[in-house]
A protein has these predicted regions:
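Short conserved micro-motifs on helix faces and helix-strand junctions that flank
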Residues: 40-41, 54, 90, 99, ...
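Alpha-helical multi-pass transmembrane bundles of energy-transducing inner-membrane proteins
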Residues: 10-14, 73-80, 84-172
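Hydrophobic alpha-helical transmembrane segments of multipass integral membrane proteins
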Residues: 1-7, 48-61, 79-86, 103-106, ...
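C-terminal ends of transmembrane helices
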Residues: 57-68, 110-119, 181
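Short, solvent-exposed coil/turn segments
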Residues: 35, 44, 123, 172-174
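Function-critical hydrophobic alpha-helical transmembrane segments in multi-pass membrane proteins
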Residues: 168-182
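Transmembrane helix-loop-helix hairpins at membrane boundaries of multipass inner-membrane proteins
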Residues: 1-62, 66-76, 150-166
Length: 182
């Protein structure tokens, strides 16, 4: 329901003429020496991804409503997974985005490993190891973007406005982040 409300609020802001890059923006400094901030906001793509994720979470909730063993624990991990996904889509800061990506990793392992079927332990371990390996590529890519841009912040909007990452470095950092997310 909140995602539908957010979508209508976003569309209302855009139709009212608000042309800001990101709407409903909030910034709080987490770690001042590296200028890492909790920066969140939405644009058209993130609103669409939030709405799709909300539909999937809503469907997943009702599909598992009558789950018997460890129901409370299941919904705790499912909520934490949802938080990681939603947080990832609203993140503007590279570090915050990476943290939300990692937050979703442990709940996926437990949801598959405990409540899955078939070779659930094998599947959960294989997925977790692959995602952790991808996280290493992603972290290297994020750090490369940060240091390669010469930015004083990990804010994606500010890094994008600098336009100073050389093409040769872009050819290195993009595949690493792509592999990390893939």
């Amino acid at each position: 329901i909140a995602s539908v409300v957010l979508t209508f609020m976003y569309l209302g802001e855009r139709s009212a003429g608000n042309t800001a890059e990101m709407l409903f923006r909030a910034d709080t400094v987490w770690y001042a020496p590296l200028n890492i901030a909790y920066s969140v906001g939405v644009d058209g793509i993130s609103v669409a991804m939030l709405l799709l994720s909300a539909i999937i979470v809503f469907t997943g909730t009702f599909a598992s409503w009558r789950l018997q063993p460890l129901t409370k624990e299941y919904f705790l991990w499912f909520t934490l997974l949802s938080m990681g996904v939603f947080g990832f889509f609203i993140s503007i800061d590279l570090f915050t985005m990476f943290m939300f990506y990692e937050i979703a990793l442990i709940p996926m392992y437990l949801l598959i490993g405990v409540w899955g079927s078939g070779r659930k332990e094998y599947a959960a371990m294989k997925l977790t190891l692959m995602l952790m390996g991808g996280s290493a590529f992603l972290l290297i890519g994020i750090l490369g973007i940060y240091f390669g841009s010469g930015a004083t912040t990990m804010n994606l909007l500010e890094i994008a406005q600098l336009h100073n990452i050389p093409f040769a470095q872009q050819c290195i950092w993009f595949p690493l982040t792509f592999l990390g997310f893939g």
